[in-house]
């Protein structure tokens, strides 16, 4: 209980520190000192801050100009690259068209050559067939002639006797005499 009494006595001397408020005494608040402490660096640092800001501004402007120049260069290079790409596409199309034309020409040449070879082979085959036909015909003629001569000789040998031979000789001699007389007249 003594503690409670001591607490009541002490609280009577000091006011309780439980709230906040506005102190209207300027000297106690040290507002002027704070203003001087804060204002002096602002006033004296104004030039330095201005120089820093100007330097930063110049750096930013320089960076922007460099970026714009690089952008222009990149744009020019892009245009040049597009032009080269277009030229390359045109050249590739020309090469492709020339290749196709050459391929068609060579294909046609091969077809023509094959047709020519086929025609030559056909002509050679036909000539060989004609030659073989002629040879066969000639062999048949020779055999027919030989057989005809053999048959005629057989018939003559059978029919030809000495009397017929004499008459034939006389007949042919008479023909020769008349022919000789006609030529001398």
From Swiss-Prot:
Gene Ontology CC terms: chloroplast thylakoid membrane; proton-transporting ATP synthase complex
A GO term, aspect molecular function: proton-transporting ATP synthase activity, rotational mechanism
Xref: InterPro entries: ATP_synth_b/b'su_bac/chlpt (IPR002146)
Pfam families the record matches: ATP-synt_B (PF00430)
Keywords, sorted A to Z: ATP synthesis, CF(0), Chloroplast, Hydrogen ion transport, Ion transport, Membrane, Plastid, Thylakoid, Transmembrane, Transmembrane helix, Transport
Main location as per UniProt: plastid
TM stretches of this protein: 31-49
Compartments where located: Plastid, Chloroplast thylakoid membrane
Its biological purpose: F(1)F(0) ATP synthase produces ATP from ADP in the presence of a proton or sodium gradient. F-type ATPases consist of two structural domains, F(1) containing the extramembraneous catalytic core and F(0) containing the membrane proton channel, linked together by a central stalk and a peripheral stalk. During catalysis, ATP synthesis in the catalytic domain of F(1) is coupled via a rotary mechanism of the central stalk subunits to proton translocation. Component of the F(0) channel, it forms part of the peripheral stalk, linking F(1) to F(0).
Additional remark text: In plastids the F-type ATPase is also known as CF(1)CF(0).
Assembly description: F-type ATPases have 2 components, F(1) - the catalytic core - and F(0) - the membrane proton channel. F(1) has five subunits: alpha(3), beta(3), gamma(1), delta(1), epsilon(1). F(0) has four main subunits: a(1), b(1), b'(1) and c(10-14). The alpha and beta chains form an alternating ring which encloses part of the gamma chain. F(1) is attached to F(0) by a central stalk formed by the gamma and epsilon chains, while a peripheral stalk is formed by the delta, b and b' chains.
Family to which the UniProt record says this protein belongs: Belongs to the ATPase B chain family.
Protein name: ATP synthase subunit b, chloroplastic
Species name: Huperzia lucidula (Shining clubmoss)
Lineage: Eukaryota, Viridiplantae, Streptophyta, Embryophyta, Tracheophyta
Encoding gene per record: atpF
